[in-house]
Amino acid sequence: MPVTMSQAFIDNFLGNSPKWFKIAILSFLIINPIIFYLNPFIAGWLLVVEFIFTLAMALKCYPLQPGGLLAIEAVAIGMTSPSQVFHELEANLEVLLLLIFMVAGIYFMKQLLLFVFTKMITKVRSKIVVSLMFCVASAFLSAFLDALTVIAVIIAVAVGFYSIYHKVASGKSFADDHDHTSDGHHQLCQDELSAFRGFLRNLLMHAGIGTALGGVCTMVGEPQNLIIAAQANWQFVEFAMRMSPVTVPVFFAGIITCFLVEKFKVFGYGQQLPEAVHTILSEFAAHEDAHRTKHDKVKLGIQALIGLWLVVGLAFHLASVGLIGLSVIIMATAFNGITNEHAIGKAFEEALPFTALLAVFFAIVAVIIDQQLFAPVIQWALSYEGNTQLVIFYIANGLLSMVSDNVFVGTVYINEVKAALLSGQITRDQFDLLAVAINTGTNLPSVATPNGQAAFLFLLTSAIAPLIRLSYGRMVWMALPYTIVLSIVGVLAIHLGALEQMTQYFYDTQMLLHHSVKDAAGAVSGH
């Protein structure tokens, strides 16, 4: 039967997405202008719900296309203006530069990071110790790098391990070509392969949680941290200090959770590395060490020095985060002899789709600002006083971040609280405390689902997920103990007064200085 033009259109529209999803998006595009004509406020909220729906369906279709179409239509029918969208992009240029340059910069440091993580797995035999090392190492790296970058590195490590084992177990040598996605090789022991997959799933989930534990601590750990820091006019060290009353107890709670789930082998954890696999990986590491040339050793040394520059540059805020990332690209490529344009271009492939998606987020944020969608919610939350207000903001951010991307949630809330500050509804000191509640609320409970954390979504949609049988449901189940512990410890740190008391102590000892409203007004604003 010949294909009609309408069938061809539906087939082409959003590619391989399910038909019901395509119809849903087309329905949204038809309904939205009608609702906007009848009631702009309801239409605005409908757009936000639709956009969250596209994020939740990220595995069916990358959210850039359906979310982007909704955003374009919103601008076209007057829900916001192109100038307001551009203003949002302008206000968040540093975040865009972080994603473009920092993620690409770390691409050129992968050799060093692969070397370090390989040593961890081959030298340490205790699964509990390896799990803790992966979790802590990911947390440390995420405090200085974007969590997406860290997960990208650890995925590369896991794919490397998997392909090495698969190749040797299929009867080939390290140097042979091999398709590690095919399990049709009769030499493969399925029990061994299944156990190894479980082991890699465990390590990737511990590393993913580690990125959340470290990412919440500093202004560069997650994109929304940078947005919050810009609105509050905080620098690197001040941001880390203000977060510490919540982030330090949460970090230790996370590490204890890592130990307990491995010790008692619950929620899918506790999978051991089979002895045969360990032997293969150790032999590979020895093979690499034996064949490492002076050129290779110099490259590792250069990457270590660049890593040191990265930490120092960020800690002392020697330049904006994106520019430090650009300097990493230039130095890592110049001193390691990477001068081919195509080789450099590969570094940008991982982050640019997400950067484009972030630009669409800001278009939706522009609609929220112009239609004043969050004003009733914010006014309700602000009607409470002191500590209760902080707890409500933490919970409100946390619940929304579980189903929607935390960059989106954090951006919306900090913009609204900033507006309340500039209109005189709250004091500057209360604004600073609310900024901490918003940052921790968006970062910690969002580990619940891949929708909330960009790094988790990146892991779920990566090449490694199908190889190690890591599905959406399995990720949610494995993240559950962490979700419960991190969320509860975070809310208790605020509810029991640790945040207010420690912040006051920092003021009293002059480790922190009070900011004025003028500081915030002078900071980059989304209004």
UniProtKB/Swiss-Prot annotation:
InterPro entries: Na+/H+_antiporter_NhaB. Its main location: membrane. The keyword Transmembrane helix applies. One of its GO terms (cellular component) is plasma membrane. It is a multi-pass membrane protein. It holds the Pfam family NhaB. One of its GO terms (molecular function) is sodium:proton antiporter activity. It is found in: Cell inner membrane. The chain crosses the membrane at residues 28-48, 52-72, 97-117, 130-164, 203-223, 248-268, 304-324, 349-369, 390-410, 448-468, 476-496. Keywords: Antiport, Cell inner membrane, Cell membrane, Ion transport, Membrane, Sodium, Sodium transport, Transmembrane, Transmembrane helix, Transport. It catalyses: 2 Na(+)(in) + 3 H(+)(out) = 2 Na(+)(out) + 3 H(+)(in). Belongs to the NhaB Na(+)/H(+) (TC 2.A.34) antiporter family. NCBIfam families: NhaB, PRK09547.1. Na(+)/H(+) antiporter that extrudes sodium in exchange for external protons. PANTHER family: NA(+)_H(+) ANTIPORTER NHAB (PTHR43302:SF1), TRANSPORTER ARSB-RELATED (PTHR43302). This is Na(+)/H(+) antiporter NhaB. It comes from Shewanella sediminis (strain HAW-EB3).
